């Protein structure tokens, strides 16, 4: 009996030497099941995703860009002492801020400039010095509006929201007054630059219907909408020396005498 009790005691100590999991035999809780399921990767439908195309947003333009100078512009250039070297700067859409007199400027972001080499080295330096507050004024330019009125504006560059833009100031209010019945928000106007016969930097905001076959009042009246449909590019100033006395208002100098 003593031996039996001793054996029982030894077995008792041996049995208690092994530690058992107190949660053994319990069912997993619903929360642990959801957590485990959420970690599993969901299969990707490759075939469905392969058919998706990324939407590309293009800038709004009412019509294809006309890189050939319209006749309206060529006639304006002839009146600017036989202007030359036309360049398309931007297809400019008018926004509400452009039409507000309190803003008093027309802006053209650098990213929208189609021909960036329209400035000379001196003009580039002057505009840069003005932007750096080294110089008070920018570059004075002649600006012809769609109604054929010529204005004297100033071209500068500003940095707005981290981006550089060209701005026409000091006279833009006069342009708004001259075209107050014409300019509408969201209208699109091609903005061109050219040089007058003396080399002065000029700009023209051409009207929408300034394409082939249109001539200006007071001009030579020639139409270039013939069989070829081509608009001639400006040629050296000496070719148009007979028209050098005309102004941008559409009236020749002879009519004022």
UniProtKB/Swiss-Prot annotation:
Top-level taxon of the source organism: Eukaryota
Principal location: nucleus
Signal peptide (UniProt feature, chain positions): none
Gene Ontology CC, one term: nucleus
Pfam families recorded: At2g31720-like
Biased composition (Polar residues): 8-35
Region of interest called Disordered, as start-end residue ranges on this chain: 5-50, 212-257
GO MF annotations in UniProt: DNA binding
Name the UniProt record assigns to this protein: Putative B3 domain-containing protein At2g27410
Species name: Arabidopsis thaliana (Mouse-ear cress)
